[in-house]
Amino acid sequence: MNLLEKTRKINAMLQKAAGRPVNFKEMAETLCDVIEANVFVVSRRGKLLGFAIKQSIENERMKRMLEERQFPEEYTRNLFNITETSPNIDINSEYTAFPVENRDLFKTGLTTIVPINGGGERLGTLILSRLDREFDNDDLILAEYGATVVGMEILREKAEEIEEEARSKAVVQMAISSLSYSELEAIEHIFEELDGTEGLLVASKIADRVGITRSVIVNALRKLESAGVIESRSLGMKGTYIKVLNDKFLTELEKLKSN
């Protein structure tokens, strides 16, 4: 395959993913195929987002690292010293992707490191490694193209997380604002009693202790449940099982209590 055909292969993978998130493993496998090298997509914290192996490396530490999907902390930290593509790093470098304890076995091992940037910050690193053959300009063009795609995907995921967090918070705030003063008071006592995200409570006991009617507690729980903030299930004489579904709820409730 020439450079154009290899680029088209990456594009075909992206078009196939149209409308859905790009799978980092799939991206690594495509790059592995067109560049003919081991490929590792590493997050800024060293998490292995995706990888593909062209040349198997028989080393227990490497096997464990791939199983745990986590690069060593020190190695990950050192990667931030590399701010532009660094091709053909040899086995004696601290940046080699080959196991240094087996230098004799991997004398011809070469590593290329490509920073993954986006939104003005470092998002991760694309690491390529292979034996015997140097990475040429075509390989580097493909690697940098791949790193750009991965960077865009990481940014998209981050934006979705921020959007989801904002949506969850808004739902909680609307649910809490729908409660009357006595219902809010009841909810505060309920979750003081639960002391966690799920548990069992007897509504009548709380009603007697706080001095409110049982119907106030039932109405408050019903409002939160209809908003999707909690789920509740009556267990008859045992009481009511309650579980928090929205992780922003307890935080927002705590804020109200401290104001």
From Swiss-Prot:
HAMAP family: HTH_type_CodY. It comes from the Bacteria. Residues 203-222 bind DNA. It is found in: Cytoplasm. The modification Phosphoserine is found at residue 215. GO terms for biological process: negative regulation of DNA-templated transcription. Belongs to the CodY family. The keyword Hydrolase does not apply. Gene3D superfamilies: 3.30.450.40, Winged helix-like DNA-binding domain superfamily/Winged helix DNA-binding domain. Keywords: Cytoplasm, DNA-binding, Phosphoprotein, Repressor, Transcription, Transcription regulation. Residues 1-155 are annotated as: GAF domain. This is Global transcriptional regulator CodY. One of its GO terms (cellular component) is cytoplasm. DNA-binding global transcriptional regulator which is involved in the adaptive response to starvation and acts by directly or indirectly controlling the expression of numerous genes in response to nutrient availability. During rapid exponential growth, CodY is highly active and represses genes whose products allow adaptation to nutrient depletion. Pfam families: CodY, HTH_CodY. One of its GO terms (molecular function) is DNA-binding transcription factor activity. The gene is codY.
